[in-house]
């Protein structure tokens, strides 16, 4: 009998604790969870694939969303379009390689996902206002 009453008291205390905890929880609407999940998937996808050639359409297909949803995500969350975000990932990697290796600029350019050195040089100069070779010289000195 005392064992049963101990269980009843324990259950009552547990219900009080749970009731207090529920009030502290931050509940999130399902639509926001999905959106955050897509943001995570987008960042992960680009991090894993920026060295390859791929389009917004291919990425959207792989993630199971329309290219319009993905395009809007880039605009609203990242405040840049798909190509700008992808080039940022590629440029960040290229800068790391320029600063930390003696690899040729051509190899760095191609390994970073750029299709040509001309595109790489133009994109790099637009972003950093300096050529990749000058950037390397300044960071290594």
What do these predicted regions represent?
Residues 1-37, 41-44, 69:
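An amphipathic alpha-helical interaction segment
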